[in-house]
From Swiss-Prot:
It catalyses: a 1,2-diacyl-sn-glycero-3-phosphocholine + H2O = a 1-acyl-sn-glycero-3-phosphocholine + a fatty acid + H(+). This is Phospholipase A2. PROSITE patterns: PA2_ASP, PA2_HIS. Ca(2+) binds at residues 53, 55, 57, 74. InterPro entries: PLipase_A2, PLipase_A2_Asp_AS, PLipase_A2_dom, PLipase_A2_dom_sf, PLipase_A2_His_AS. GO terms for molecular function: calcium ion binding; calcium-dependent phospholipase A2 activity; phospholipid binding; toxin activity. It comes from Micrurus altirostris. It is found in: Secreted. Residues 1-21 form the signal peptide.
Length: 140
């Protein structure tokens, strides 16, 4: 793995570790970060702290289309926890990246399939949405 990707992963994990009142736990964001890199040239770390929903927590009104992608992803993870009774941060799934196209592979549980699709749809949304530099660290 590229050292820059490891740095991004560490920064995202550190920023998300304070997202709950329980003791911080290792979070599985490796796959999501790699999915983002599959179809986006912007470094994954650029998304953490963007708008009101990208990164740790999320509240208020999304500032733009990209921030809405993060809000939808947050809600998707929430649904994984409540409806599918799984922890999306600990769920490892199978996927493929080929020529910028993401495909969730044959995952043997509903939880894995659901979380994979949360991440795939968010990565695709990130790739399509404009990134407005002034919205980084700018929740209005």
């Amino acid at each position: 793995m590229n050292p820059a990707h490891l740095l991004v992963l560490a920064a995202v994990c550190i920023s998300l570790s304070g997202a709950s009142s329980i003791a911080p736990q290792p979070l599985n964001l490796i796959q999501f970060g790699n999915m983002i890199q599959c179809n986006n040239t912007r470094p994954s770390l650029d998304f953490s702290g963007y708008g009101c929903y990208c990164g740790r927590g999320g509240s208020g009104t999304p500032v733009d289309e990209l921030d809405r992608c993060c809000q939808v992803h947050d809600n998707c993870y929430g649904e994984a926890e409540t409806v599918h009774e799984c922890d999306p941060y600990w769920t490892f799934y199978s996927y493929e990246c080929s020529e910028g196209k993401l495909t969730c592979k044959d995952n043997n549980t509903k939880c894995k399939e659901f979380v994979c699709n949360c991440d795939r749809e968010a990565a695709n949304c990130f790739a399509k949405a404009p990134y407005i530099d002034s919205n980084y660290k700018n929740c209005k």
